[in-house]
Amino acid sequence: MAVPKMVFSDVESFLDSHPELFEDYLNRKGSSSMVEKWLKNHQAGKSEAEPKEEKSSVCKDSWASKCDGLQRRASQKELRKTFARSKAINVNRTYDEHVNSRAQEPLTSMRRRALLRKASSLPPTTAHILSALLESRVNIPQYPSTAVDFKYYLKEHNEREFFLELVKDISNDLDLTSLSYKILVFVCIMVDADRCSLFLVEGTGNKKTLVSKFFDVHAGTTVLPSMNSGEVQVPWGKGIIGYVAEHGETVNIPDAYQDRRFSDEIDKLTGYKTKSLLCMPIQNSDGEIIGVAQAINKSSSGELFTEDDEKVLQMYLPFCGIAISNAQLFAASRKEYDRSRALLEVVNDLFEEQTDLEKIVRKIMHRAQTLLKCERCSVQLLEDIESPVVKFTKSFELLSPKCSADAESSFKDSMEKSSYSDWLINNSIAELVASTGLPVNISDAYQDPRFDAEADQFSDFHIRSVLCVPIWNSNHQIIGVAQVLNRLDGKPFDDADQRLFEAFVIFCGLGINNTIMYDQVKKSWAKQSVALDVLSYHATCSKTEVDKFKAANIPLVCELGIDKLSFDDFSLDVDAMITAALRMFIELGMVQKFKIDYETLCRWLLTVRKNYRMVLYHNWRHAFNVCQCMFAMLTTAGFQETLTDVEILALIVGCVCHDLDHRGTNNAFQAKTGSALSLLYGTSATLEHHHFNHAVMILQSEGHNIFCNLSSTEYSDLMQLLKQSILATDLTLYFENRNSFFELVSIGEYNWNVKTHRDMCRSMMMTACDLGAVTKPWDISRKVAELVTSEFFEQGDRERSELKLTPSAIFDRNRKDELPGLQLEWIDGICAPLYETLVKLNPKLQPMVDMINANRVKWEELDKKRQHDHGASVPASPCSAAEGSETGGVPCCSNNTPPTHVS
């Protein structure tokens, strides 16, 4: 029976009239490839609404009408499949043609609330914020390709338009994967080949290979093959493909099996029979071969590839070379961007975690696996970085999730084994890197003599490639090694991997070193805490002593004589000074007004006494004498009536504590020797800051806080005043403030109601009490001067022996006969102006000035006798008193002769 001749338009018209027949046929005969082809053509048809050329308008209209018809008949299931497919495709796309249109759509109130809930449900971490900031803002446009059938139509009706269409399709694609696929399909169409393959050159120098991610692609294929199907690799120079790549020649073979260069390995691998073959190199703009295009078997049975086919490919492949080069450049730049971003994220990880070694190593290994895409990562830390013997004390290991069902447990298991020195596979290479400091990159482990193949054979994990680099600290010392094993793609680690890993490990070394240092600091802090606890126990008084003074009868002020400005500094023994100090607190009403527990006061005074060192002058007796002088000024001179109770308490406590833990040397000596105190407090008022902090430490000790019953405001004010009082004993501050104070008093503008005036007055009172020995009767004043000089001589001896310096006159034991002259300078330059000004403010202090003048006469007589005995005047050493002061840098006096004495 003769079949009537039909044309496509008749069939299409019939199907339009009977859609149920078309659906029935599609359900019975349709395949998944047909559906995928329809989806792709449907998307392409939507983007081609208007033709650019009159000549192709009829054909494009027919394809569009067909797609529209199919779209009208699409079921909800097909629409869901379309959405799912488009979503899968767009997951990793850098550009979405629908993004801008969606962004312009107004948000409904419901959607706005949903977005707000999503945004505010969890606070963003720094890692998420950094990731968002580093997200690439470069959008690469992607244009859909026209249908394959349409390209066949153009090939038959308009070769020029056909060629331009193929060039346009590849020129807009910067994704190397989709570009390679397009080139294969287009080559098949151009030369009418049954199969096509594209091999790209990878590697450099003598390590070049030809790799094909898409092999044996049909011209009618519309969906990209799976990336999991594996890739075909051809060695450089092997087979016809290798020959073409090596020599850059076109090969057109009518019968491949008759050519000795042909290798049938791929045919055996694919089960496909190669007959005719056309193979041509692809070059970049520099003429370098970057790939090989291969067309296999003409679609028309029995036909061979012609010279026209060669000419067509010779015209088209240069455009392919440009497109491939651009895609490779973009891929390389994208890879560098990803690596740079990963390194920044590593830095963020290291700054986020610097306290736990296990956590930071774990983050490092996760990042290393992400960066280098390896199966296994390990970090080993040296036991002693100074030792020439390599011994690892800690080893950490992490398996890739693709190699281990539970990466968490694999990490923990390796931690449990960290006490064993031989648990880590291939430990010999790690030891080699740790000893030499040079990285090791092994592409084939079993071919390298440094690799322990026997250990690998007994393991469940088999090593192919190894990259091991040293970990350095900030002092360029090796603290460990980092090692990655087996790239996931099966390739060896290349030079780019090694450079990246070395850069990565630099940051890791800093992070690990900081964590180790933190651990050391934490241990040191613990040791210090224990030491302070022990010292605190031995630095505090015993309960027996406290009970003794708590039960003792306290003599009256008149019995002790502590209210006199001429009090004998050596009249009381060490225990009597405690009872006298208790009497001062009681007499001033401090115990009652501030509700000071009497037992706590006894304990505090005894502990303060115990924390004064047994030096010649700056000891407990000096502290008590300064406190007694302040007590006399407050009571006898009447300053108690002018100052507040909090100010009085701060002054008394400040006097008792103003030289706590004095070492018998001044501030200048601390700076010269670079002592721990100068490093801790700096070179400005070094000892005074230490005295205050030591006082605070005692107050904070259990059972010693005599201020515990003060209100928070009173306590805060008192501590500020206490610090000010103790720091005021630094003569540098005295010289900074005295001119202003002297001028205010001299012109009668001093005002007790002005805070700055009161602050200056209290500071001057502290200095006056600290230097009070010069106002005592001659025998007492001279004895104190000799004690001070003896202490200075000991410092001078240390300067000469330890620092190899010649001490100034006041510290030089060989010049002790110059003491009278230095004392005259001390009185005239520092003491007399201070007390004379205080007398103008409070005339009741006149006895102190009178005694200074009397003592000056005595020193002047001794100085004249010294000059007479020597037969000439011997001037004092310049700036000797400046060094005698605890500041070591006080200004010289008005007569340009520096003062000499110090309290």
UniProtKB/Swiss-Prot annotation:
Record's protein name: Dual 3',5'-cyclic-AMP and -GMP phosphodiesterase 11A
What does the similarity note say?
Belongs to the cyclic nucleotide phosphodiesterase family.
Under the cellular component aspect of Gene Ontology, which terms does the record hold? cytosol
The GO terms describing molecular function are:
3',5'-cyclic-AMP phosphodiesterase activity; 3',5'-cyclic-GMP phosphodiesterase activity; metal ion binding
Q: What does this protein do?
A: Plays a role in signal transduction by regulating the intracellular concentration of cyclic nucleotides cAMP and cGMP. Catalyzes the hydrolysis of both cAMP and cGMP to 5'-AMP and 5'-GMP, respectively.
Positions bound to a divalent metal cation 1:
H622, H658, D659, D770
Q: Which SUPFAM superfamilies match?
A: GAF domain-like (SSF55781), HD-domain/PDEase-like (SSF109604)
Q: Where in the cell is it found?
A: Cytoplasm, Cytosol
The record's keywords, sorted A to Z, are: Allosteric enzyme, cAMP, cGMP, Cytoplasm, Hydrolase, Metal-binding, Repeat
- Which residues hold a divalent metal cation 2? D659
- Record GO biological process: signal transduction
Compositional bias (Polar residues) at which positions? 893-903
Gene that specifies this protein: pde11a
Region of interest (Disordered), residue spans: 863-903
Instruction: Output the CDD domains linked to this UniProt entry.
Output: HDc (cd00077)
Tell me the cofactors it needs. a divalent metal cation
Kindly indicate whether the keyword Magnesium belongs to this entry. no
> Which residue ranges does the record assign to the GAF domain?
175-324, 356-512
Gene3D superfamilies xref list: 3'5'-cyclic nucleotide phosphodiesterase, catalytic domain, 3.30.450.40
What does the record give as the reaction this protein catalyses? Answer: 3',5'-cyclic GMP + H2O = GMP + H(+); 3',5'-cyclic AMP + H2O = AMP + H(+)
Major localisation: cytoplasm
User: What does the entry's cofactor note say about binding and number?
Assistant: Binds 2 divalent metal cations per subunit. Site 1 may preferentially bind zinc ions, while site 2 has a preference for magnesium and/or manganese ions.
Looking at the record, the residues that make up the PDEase domain are 542-866
Known EC number: 3.1.4.35, 3.1.4.53
Q: Which residues are noted in the entry as 3',5'-cyclic GMP-binding?
A: S378
Domain comment from the record reads as follows: The tandem GAF domains bind cGMP, and regulate enzyme activity. The binding of cGMP stimulates enzyme activity.
Which Pfam families does this chain map to?
GAF, PDEase_I
